[in-house]
């Protein structure tokens, strides 16, 4: 079957002969062009981090937040079309408020994931709407512990130990997999903050010609009493310093290895001398 739309991408409610919805696939492309966002599930909470590119010197620092508070115990971050992400955040807030008004208790995060997933999936069924060009990572803490989910433009959502989306998702996923392998017992919330900063800095290496701001938030039973809050001040600076030190340390090791190889080659190289040169008793070489 062909990999292009050939007319089957003109409507959101039509499948191609090989069972594909091209409008959803195009929405995924919009997500892949977005800035890198990650989420890490730790021992007693979750940590979110996002790379915010500075597109203009006129932007006010720390004002254009991308990590959002959905409910007191739920946070989210997204990659893709920013207006679509803001709309989903507002819809999520409505769902959380509606649940609390009806049942007199904060919405469980799995129930929140199901409601928001159904809303996103409904936008893949009708000709009068289009899919959301955004992938959302959300999570928090409820009475059953910590939860982390990622919601895709198709409306499907999955629970994760670590999730990444956006342009730098491949390198970010590789680092998250290393974390899971090296820390099977899990991370503390503070350690997860440092690792999240490091992963965002590593993911930014492919786009290093552009400046960016690092934004981090967390929701932890031990650190924030189960509330979703932004990481600021000394802790944020400590995470940034840790990330830069780790990355610069790796670069220094690579340079040392290359220097050692060059030194070894120099030792084995023959010494060129002039045929008319003579050596005195003290070993100095003089040209005749």
Swiss-Prot record:
Keywords: Acetylation, Cytoplasm, Nucleus, Proteasome. It comes from the Eukaryota. Pfam families: Proteasome, Proteasome_A_N. Present with 12000 molecules/cell in log phase SD medium. One of its GO terms (biological process) is proteasome-mediated ubiquitin-dependent protein catabolic process. The proteasome degrades poly-ubiquitinated proteins in the cytoplasm and in the nucleus. It is essential for the regulated turnover of proteins and for the removal of misfolded proteins. The proteasome is a multicatalytic proteinase complex that is characterized by its ability to cleave peptides with Arg, Phe, Tyr, Leu, and Glu adjacent to the leaving group at neutral or slightly basic pH. It has an ATP-dependent proteolytic activity. Its main location: cytoplasm. The keyword Nucleus applies. InterPro entries: Ntn_hydrolases_N, Proteasome_alpha, Proteasome_alpha-type, Proteasome_asu_N, Proteasome_sua/b. This is Probable proteasome subunit alpha type-7. Residues 249-268 have a biased composition (Acidic residues). The alpha and beta forms are probably products of the same gene with different post-translational modifications. Residues 247-288 are annotated as: Disordered. Residues 269-279 have a biased composition (Low complexity). It is found in: Cytoplasm; Nucleus. Belongs to the peptidase T1A family. CDD domains: proteasome_alpha_type_3. The modification N-acetylthreonine is found at residue 2. GO terms for molecular function: mRNA binding. The 26S proteasome consists of a 20S proteasome core and two 19S regulatory subunits. The 20S proteasome core is composed of 28 subunits that are arranged in four stacked rings, resulting in a barrel-shaped structure. The two end rings are each formed by seven alpha subunits, and the two central rings are each formed by seven beta subunits. The catalytic chamber with the active sites is on the inside of the barrel. One of its GO terms (cellular component) is proteasome complex.
């Amino acid at each position: 079957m062909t990999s292009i739309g050939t007319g089957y991408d003109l409507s959101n409610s039509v499948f191609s002969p090989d069972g594909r919805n091209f409008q959803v696939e195009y929405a995924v492309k919009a997500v892949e062009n977005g800035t890198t966002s990650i989420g890490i599930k730790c021992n007693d909470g979750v940590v979110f981090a996002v790379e915010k590119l500075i597109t203009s010197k006129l932007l006010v620092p720390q004002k254009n937040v991308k990590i959002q508070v959905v409910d007191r115990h739920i946070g989210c971050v997204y990659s893709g079309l920013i207006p679509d992400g803001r709309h989903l955040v507002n819809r999520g807030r409505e769902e959380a408020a509606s649940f609390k008004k009806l049942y007199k208790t904060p919405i469980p995060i799995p129930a929140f994931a199901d409601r928001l997933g159904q809303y996103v999936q409904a936008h893949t069924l009708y000709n009068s709407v289009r899919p959301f060009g955004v992938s959302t990572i959300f999570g928090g803490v409820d009475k059953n512990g910590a939860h982390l989910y990622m919601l895709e433009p198709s409306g499907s959502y999955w629970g994760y130990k670590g999730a990444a989306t956006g342009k730098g998702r491949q390198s970010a996923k590789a680092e998250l997999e290393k974390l899971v392998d090296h820390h099977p017992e899990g991370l503390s919330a503070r350690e997860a903050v440092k690792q999240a900063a490091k992963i965002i800095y590593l993911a930014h290496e492919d786009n290093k010609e552009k400046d960016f701001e690092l934004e981090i938030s967390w929701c932890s039973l031990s650190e924030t009493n189960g509330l979703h809050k932004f990481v600021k001040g000394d802790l944020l600076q400590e995470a940034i310093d840790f990330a830069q030190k780790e990355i610069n340390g790796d670069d220094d090791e690579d340079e040392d290895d290359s220097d050692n190889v060059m030194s070894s080659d120099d030792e084995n190289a023959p010494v060129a001398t002039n045929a008319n040169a003579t050596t005195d008793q003290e070993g100095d070489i003089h040209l005749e």
